[in-house]
């Protein structure tokens, strides 16, 4: 159940209006009734006035019993369904669902064009048009913030940082030594631009290396809560356009992440490694330092990468190997344990 404390339901919406709204990503196969749809719900909870969706075939069995008035399904879906449920076919049903959420819901919390009195903003800082600057925000000298941006409560933006237009920077973020593009979202507690973990060791003493690089973040990037992105020692740390970085990710100094890559929670990338374009790193993946990971690489969850990977490869395990080899290793290990247990019982 969606809480009305936080989200406003914009329904009811006519089914015909929903089809019109999604017209460019669905494939209408019939004339739809002009019925009222009040909400979006999962198949198991939907009522006769709700719409649902199916993107994972594991849940297809619920289409036989769901009470939903309509359901968005994959393009080639042909399984048996409740005869009272209207099917709407989409090339990507999950994407259609994500668009439909915007059609049905809006957050209760809204941001006006306002600078809160408790915000501390340096005289030399430049704040664009139609910005919201929240309570106890600190913006230091020579900062530039683009138009239509939101800087929420308790965030710190250090001297000289440049943030593009349409940014959404949530609470208690700190940003130093960074240039950030347009349409960027940075979630609660993220830390960007701090020193990296760089030391030179001489006679048993670890001497701190002064970091003189910065962090460069492209356009339309999202960075999750409590993620940390270190600035470079000599070469900059770079996050290219369209990247999606989950919560609790550590990105070391001098790392480059290519366009459109996605990194899942608790992954860690050591200094000076380069991740190619449109790569996917699963949860808790570890990438050693000074490696090159080719475009389109996929690393399964908890994979440990210790050597370069050619583009387009899918790997898993630690140390990471081609995914089919990893599956074979897992099967062999299971068989060895089973055999060992049998011998111990004897």
From Swiss-Prot:
Superkingdom in the source lineage:
Bacteria
Report the EC number(s), separated by commas if there are several. Answer: 2.3.1.191
Q: Which GO terms describe its cellular component?
A: membrane
One GO BP on record is: lipid A biosynthetic process
Q: Give the reactions, separated by semicolons, that this protein catalyses.
A: a UDP-3-O-[(3R)-3-hydroxyacyl]-alpha-D-glucosamine + a (3R)-hydroxyacyl-[ACP] = a UDP-2-N,3-O-bis[(3R)-3-hydroxyacyl]-alpha-D-glucosamine + holo-[ACP] + H(+)
Pathway in which this enzyme or protein is active: Bacterial outer membrane biogenesis; LPS lipid A biosynthesis
Q: Does the keyword Transferase apply?
A: yes
Give the positions the UniProt entry annotates as the active site. Answer: 253
**InterPro entries, per database record:** Hexapep (IPR001451), Hexapep_transf_CS (IPR018357), LpxD (IPR007691), Trimer_LpxA-like_sf (IPR011004), UDP_GlcNAc_AcTrfase_non-rep (IPR020573)
| Keywords for this protein | Acyltransferase, Lipid A biosynthesis, Lipid biosynthesis, Lipid metabolism, Repeat, Transferase
Picking any one GO molecular function of the record gives: N-acyltransferase activity
Q: What does this protein do?
A: Catalyzes the N-acylation of UDP-3-O-acylglucosamine using 3-hydroxyacyl-ACP as the acyl donor. Is involved in the biosynthesis of lipid A, a phosphorylated glycolipid that anchors the lipopolysaccharide to the outer membrane of the cell.
Q: Which PANTHER family match?
A: UDP-3-O-ACYLGLUCOSAMINE N-ACYLTRANSFERASE, UDP-3-O-ACYLGLUCOSAMINE N-ACYLTRANSFERASE 1, MITOCHONDRIAL-RELATED
Assembly and binders: Homotrimer.
Q: Which family does it belong to?
A: Belongs to the transferase hexapeptide repeat family. LpxD subfamily.
Q: What is this protein called?
A: UDP-3-O-acylglucosamine N-acyltransferase
Q: What is the lineage of its organism?
A: Bacteria, Pseudomonadati, Pseudomonadota, Alphaproteobacteria, Rickettsiales
Question: Per UniProt, what is the name of the gene that codes for the protein in this document?
Answer: lpxD
């Amino acid at each position: 159940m969606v809480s009305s404390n936080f989200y406003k339901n914009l329904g009811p919406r006519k089914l015909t209006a929903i089809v019109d709204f999604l017209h460019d990503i669905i494939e209408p196969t019939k004339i739809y009734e002009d019925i009222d749809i009040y909400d979006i719900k999962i198949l198991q909870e939907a009522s006769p006035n709700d719409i649902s969706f199916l993107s994972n075939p594991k849940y297809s069995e619920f289409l036989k019993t769901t009470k939903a008035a309509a359901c968005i399904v994959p393009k080639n879906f042909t399984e048996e369904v409740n005869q009272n449920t209207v099917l709407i076919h989409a090339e990507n049903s999950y994407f259609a669902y994500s668009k439909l959420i915007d059609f049905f819901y809006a957050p209760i919390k809204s941001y006006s064009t306002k600078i809160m009195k408790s915000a501390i903003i340096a005289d030399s800082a430049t704040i664009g048009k139609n910005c919201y600057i929240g309570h106890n925000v600190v913006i230091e000298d020579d900062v530039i913030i683009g138009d239509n941006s939101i800087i929420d409560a308790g965030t710190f933006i250090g001297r000289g940082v440049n943030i593009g237009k349409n940014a959404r920077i949530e609470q208690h973020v700190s940003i130093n030594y960074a240039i950030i593009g347009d349409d960027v979202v940075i979630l609660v507690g993220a830390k960007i631009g701090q020193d990296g973990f760089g030391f030179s060791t001489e006679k048993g003493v670890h001497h701190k290396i002064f970091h003189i690089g910065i962090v460069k973040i492209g356009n339309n990037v999202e960075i999750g809560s409590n993620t940390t992105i270190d600035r470079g020692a000599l070469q900059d740390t770079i996050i290219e356009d369209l990247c999606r970085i989950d919560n609790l990710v550590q990105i070391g100094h001098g790392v480059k992440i290519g366009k459109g890559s996605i990194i899942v929670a608790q992954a860690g990338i050591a200094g000076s490694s380069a991740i190619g374009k449109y790569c996917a790193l699963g949860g808790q993946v570890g990438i050693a330092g000074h490696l090159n990971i080719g475009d389109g690489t996929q690393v399964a969850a908890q994979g440990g990468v210790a050597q370069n990977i050619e583009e387009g490869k899918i790997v898993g395990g630690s140390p990471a190997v081609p995914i089919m080899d990893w599956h074979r290793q897992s099967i062999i290990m299971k068989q060895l344990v089973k055999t060992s247990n049998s011998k111990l019982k004897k």
